[in-house]
Regions:
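Detector for outer-membrane/organellar transmembrane beta-barrel domains
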Residues: 24-27, 171-176, 195, 205-305
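Gram-negative outer-membrane beta-barrel proteins
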Residues: 36-44, 82-88, 112, 128-132, ...
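Hydrophobic, lipid-facing positions within transmembrane beta-strands of outer-membrane proteins
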Residues: 56-62, 99-106, 161-165, 198-202, ...
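Outer-membrane beta-barrel "beta-signal"
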Residues: 319, 342-363
């Protein structure tokens, strides 16, 4: 399970070049993933955007990794993204470009006999909840869109980094992780923001056989801040109102097939209004057709305690001109009370390239 421990570290740092790190005792690497997307959807013509049905977006993620020695590593991930890029941006106004520090942490790794390992990280990192955050990079995500629970704007699991500490451990076929951070994944707070409260998250998994792993995760802690849209007058102190999430996940790979799935339940507590709950889930499959082409699909749903739910169906054909580039052709069908006819459907093309900009190694 030594390989799995390294995967835990790389996933938390959004795939920051573990293979390179294994080749040398110390050194520095800067890896980059750049993507561009062009979606077409009638959602883009609705208020408040009121724009053309066709638009474009770009995204770049820089992954610096400084390996100090065989046990200590400093890793980071910095993202520059234009708006709109993902479907959740379609309901926002105007255009813009924003930079975000997603990851910056110091890690320590140890291995022992009998497939045991521990990775300790301190700094800014992604939430330990869920499974999709390991595939946030467009080169790792076979689809163009993202599952409904994940995102930037009031989603129960943020893509943005949280500040704290995490321990990942493996023992044989078991793996586990525990995390304590400065804010909830349901409402990420910067270390410079008010209303920061400690939050716990963790998860565990078991590899039934090679290629098949099942797991679960959870988080708990205060999430509201006094400027939150749903923090109404007369509400209780934010630190007494927790958000909680529980989830199950599965990953399977066999031959030319890969599949992923998650089921999640979230609850946000209030005093002046009823508690809000959300159920969501998705199933995703990818079939490699030949060395250059693959087909992928994702089916997802959302159900809420207040308001109607929705479901989505995304289909993608992917083409790899070479090992460093990927072109995706996708179509998404979104159904729900907020969509009329084909209004929520999205046709999109995404181009992705990944390369190693700097690599300095020292034995």
């Amino acid at each position: 399970m030594r390989v799995y421990a390294l995967l835990c570290l790389s996933a938390a740092c959004l795939f920051t070049g573990v293979a390179w790190a294994q080749e040398a005792n110390s050194g520095f690497e800067l890896r980059t993933t750049v993507s561009a997307v062009s979606p077409e959807s009638q959602q883009l013509t609705d208020a408040p955007r009121d724009g053309s049905p066709v638009t474009g977006g770009v995204r770049a993620i820089l992954y610096p990794t400084w390996k100090l020695n065989s046990r200590w590593t400093i890793s980071g991930a910095y993202q520059v993204i234009s708006r709109p890029y993902f479907a959740e941006d379609f309901g926002t106004q105007g255009h813009g470009v924003k930079g975000e520090l997603l990851q910056l942490n110091l890690s320590y790794v140890r291995f022992w006999e009998h497939n045991r390992s521990v990775v300790v990280r301190v700094g800014q990192m992604s939430s330990a909840f869920g499974a999709f955050l390991q595939r946030y990079d467009s080169m790792q995500n076979p689809l163009i869109g993202i599952p409904a629970a994940y995102g930037y704007y009031y989603n129960p699991v943020t893509f943005l980094g949280l500040v704290g500490a995490q321990v990942d451990a493996t023992a044989g076929k078991f793996d586990a992780r525990a995390q304590f951070v400065n804010s909830s994944p349901a409402n990420r707070r910067s270390i410079f923001d008010n209303d920061q409260y400690g939050n716990w998250a963790g998860g565990a998994g078991y590899t039934i056989r090679q290629g098949l792993r099942v797991g679960g995760s959870a988080y708990y802690g205060p999430y509201l801040d006094r400027k939150y849209p749903y923090f109404f007058p007369g509400e209780a102190d934010p630190k007494s109102l927790p958000a909680s999430g529980v989830g199950l996940d599965v990953e399977w790979g066999w031959g030319h097939w890969n599949a992923w799935g998650e089921w999640q339940r979230f609850q946000m507590d209030y005093h002046v209004i009823p508690n809000f709950t959300q159920h969501t889930g998705y199933a995703e499959v990818r079939r490699t057709l030949n060395p250059r082409w693959y087909a992928a699909a994702r089916i997802g749903y959302q159900r809420y305690s207040v308001g109607p739910g929705a479901q989505s169906y995304e289909f993608v054909a992917g083409f790899r001109p070479n090992p460093y580039q990927l072109i995706k052709f996708g179509y998404t069908v979104q159904q729900g009370a907020e969509y009329s006819g084909t209004q929520g459907n999205i046709a999109a093309i995404e181009f992705v390239t990944s390369f190693r900009a700097i690599s300095l190694a020292k034995d």
